[in-house]
A protein has these predicted regions:
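Short, acidic/polar
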Residues: 19-30, 77-92, 145-151, 171-172
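N-terminal binding-site loop/beta-alpha segment at the start of enzyme catalytic domains
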Residues: 1-65, 82, 126, 193-197
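Active-site mouth loops of central-metabolism enzymes
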Residues: 10-21, 70-79, 109-118
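Beta/alpha (TIM)-barrel catalytic core signal, keyed to glycine-rich beta->alpha loops juxtaposed to Asp/Glu
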Residues: 22, 104-206
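CE4/NodB-like, metal-dependent polysaccharide N-deacetylase domain
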Residues: 81-102, 129-133, 154
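Short acidic capping loops at alpha-helix termini that bridge into adjacent secondary structure
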Residues: 12, 61-65, 95-99, 137-138, ...
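Conserved, mostly hydrophobic/aromatic
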Residues: 15, 37, 51, 67, ...
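A short, structured active-site edge motif that brings together acidic residues
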Residues: 63-75, 99-105, 164-167
Length: 206
């Protein structure tokens, strides 16, 4: 277990739910002992409902699980973040989350039909509100670079508990990991074996 700076315990290894992971695979993950499940609101890559269905059938107490979800970048902004959060609770069939992260610091590509209501700074304030209410046990960010994380650390009332980033043998993320270590923020890596695609420029991709 990793201990976040607020004392919350988080499993060291989790089951990533990107790529439209379905209930049978999730039930298998539960049966072999996975207890951390990482999902997100972005239906472009994730299906929170499948996670919720698996948990409902998995015969594991909610208190034994660590559920992480992430805000869709189209909902950046104070009001929209607070409005979007309950959707994750409903889809995951839970009354609280163990961690809720900003998925990206901004919208990009085709993710957003229009500009979000606000920016990541306003959205972070909303996460701090959710944390103060006890609706989430830890808050953090995903896909923030060192400069953006430093900006967050400079303005946050609640220091992020968790920073999630892609890391594999070709992307060690040393500056970001060092920044997290200096501030007592837990670094969490995803896609550590490599991204799930064949790419001659990425020899470690799986």
């Amino acid at each position: 277990m990793a201990t976040l700076h607020n004392g919350v315990l988080m499993p060291m290894v989790g089951f990533g739910c990107a790529g439209y992971v379905r209930k049978p695979a999730l039930l298998d993950a539960l049966s072999v002992g996975y207890r951390l499940f990482d999902t997100a609101q972005a239906h472009e890559w994730y299906l929170e409902e499948e996670v919720g269905d698996a948990i409902a059938e998995g015969h594991v107490n909610r208190s034994e699980l660590f559920l992480t979800s992430k805000l869709h970048p189209r909902d950046l902004g104070a009001t929209r973040t607070l409005e979007a959060f309950p959707d994750s609770l409903r889809r995951l069939r839970t009354t609280y989350l163990d961690a809720f992260l900003l998925h990206y610091p901004r919208c990009f590509g085709t993710l957003c039909a229009k500009e979000p209501e606000g920016d990541w700074r306003a959205a972070w304030g909303a996460l701090e509100t959710l944390y103060a209410r006890g609706e989430v046990r830890a808050i953090g960010v995903s896909n923030f670079g060192p400069a953006e994380l430093q900006q967050l650390l400079d303005v946050a009332k609640v220091k992020p508990h968790l920073v999630q980033s892609w890391m594999d043998p070709l992307h060690a993320e040393r500056p970001l990991r060092a920044l997290c270590a200096r501030h007592g923020v837990q670094f969490q890596a995803y896609s550590t074996p490599g991204l799930p695609r064949q790419d001659s420029s990425q020899p470690f991709s799986a």
